[in-house]
């Protein structure tokens, strides 16, 4: 199944490694990780990012909240089961 991240981005739920709140996860470790992986970051086009979605191939800055994305992922998982 696929999940819509906002900004016209859709990813496979199988490729998602984690969904994180943008503001809550700006620890030094996360900042270092994002700097090292900056070539994989896909920035949010519409407004301020509210969440970070880490996938196998890319890191997306999403304008949708992490709780909204979590609900979408759970819904897709329930449909898939």
Curated annotation (Swiss-Prot):
The species this protein belongs to is: Bacillus subtilis (strain 168)
Q: What does this protein do?
A: Regulates the biosynthesis of the extracellular matrix and the biofilm formation. May act as an enhancer of biofilm gene expression. Acts in parallel to the pathway that governs SinR derepression.
Database matches in InterPro entries: RemA-like
What is this protein called in UniProt? Extracellular matrix regulatory protein B
What Pfam families does its record include? RemA-like (PF04025)
Q: What does a knockout show?
A: Mutation impairs pellicle formation, complex colony architecture and motility inhibition in a sinR mutant background.
